[in-house]
Amino acid sequence: MTQYYFLSSFLPTQLPESVPLFSISDLDDLLYLNLSENDLCNYGLLKRFFDFENFAFFWAGKPIPFSFGEVTQENVERMLSSQQWSDDNDFEDFFKDFLMNHKSSQDRLNHFSDLFREFLSYHQTNSSKFLRDYFRFQQQLRVVLAGFRARVLNMDVSYVLRDEDSSDPVVLEVLMQKDSPNYELPEEFSDLQGVLDDYGLLPHTLNRALALYQFHKLEGFCSDSYFDGNVILARCATYMFAIRNSLASVEKGREIINHIEKAIKW
């Protein structure tokens, strides 16, 4: 029996800069005992999101720095060879198409942002409310950061965003600022303006500031939910942020922000 009330009451609030309240193995054990099969699938998808950049590390020939158990140093090569997340869970069609169209590791690395965009888009249509909202936020955040980066590097933003959905209000608003003297963020991201103004040219500091920004935004994704799977997933995401932040070195911080800023095809 799913025990939403128990879990919602038991899982404490995680502070962003505090020691992680759970290890991923402890969190797995707790949730496997108390969540339904469907909720566990959504939990696995959340971990898959946090692990997705590990494919980029593998294709770059670098060791995977950390995993939440979905994409690990031990299983990544087998997963790509079999095109399966697990024995009973094949890769999505967009992932299979990507592997077929991009054969070499370098080509896959060069187009990794396309793959990640497809992942976020695809799972906005077939997952829980929290994941739909969270993945949409992540996709739009990457557009906003790409627009900012294009402005800093004096690049043509319409070229940078050429493969994005121009009917998306956030994409459209960023594109409309092509010739504007100042880069004004879309209203949904107005609270990010100060972060970019203060830290936009300091990669590692910006990484930490963006991590905090994303952490605090999690609270809004389940503000209208009580004692259900969406609350549990949002709380789990805060634990994962804390775990990753506790392990991030300066070098890792630069790697992360580089992936975030470049998560649009150039």
From Swiss-Prot:
Pfam families from the UniProt entry: DUF2764 (PF10962)
Outcome of mutating residue 132 to Q: In strain: CWL029 and TW-183
Domain of life: Bacteria
Family: Belongs to the chlamydial CPn_0087/CT_309/TC_0583 family.
Name the record gives this protein: Uncharacterized protein CPn_0087/CP_0687/CPj0087/CpB0087
